[in-house]
């Protein structure tokens, strides 16, 4: 896996987050994909308070304990909630603009660093990967590398809290059957590109994965897994330890 961070001219989400932090408003954050129609991400949603968060995120924050690593922390909404509870939290993101916004918001330890950078400190009791945490793997084949890296960052009795969704509902017919090409790429592998004002990000791979498959891959890496919570629409929170 690469260890890059984003350049500011290729960081539309970070630009939107910093705009909103500084002015209380932001333009349209457009989300493009070769698989779906163009969508828009409400930037205000990235600044949600704990009571505005989906149930799965609230559950993850309840389960967090000890020293916490928040991966892909974005605007820092999860980190700030845990800080207020008195936990020691390190927030990391590959977006320098997001990290700037987090510091302005009061995140005590925000670092612009890639998860796979060897200089990232270790020794965490809880690792959080929220807002479809499996996404950063990009492809199914990269999940073992991701899990092994997370294991290396954990303390002996630590836990990984990660959420995702099973995209099979996209292929569901009215009779309840599914039109999934079993010979093609895994159906949860998608691609996205984001645009904010004149800032155009590079296209990137993103992974949604069903829990049984995620659990089986984690087990090959020596991790035990359990379903911590299920959402209302094929989404779930998993806990690995």
Sequence positions of predicted segments:
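SAM-dependent methyltransferase
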Residues: 7, 19, 156-213
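A short glycine-rich, Lys/Arg-flanked "PGG" loop and its adjoining helix->strand segment in the class I
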Residues: 143-156
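N-terminal auxiliary segments of SAM/dcSAM-dependent transferases
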Residues: 1-30
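Conserved alpha-helix/loop element of class I SAM-dependent methyltransferases that forms part
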Residues: 43, 47-67
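Conserved SAM/SAH-binding loop
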Residues: 75
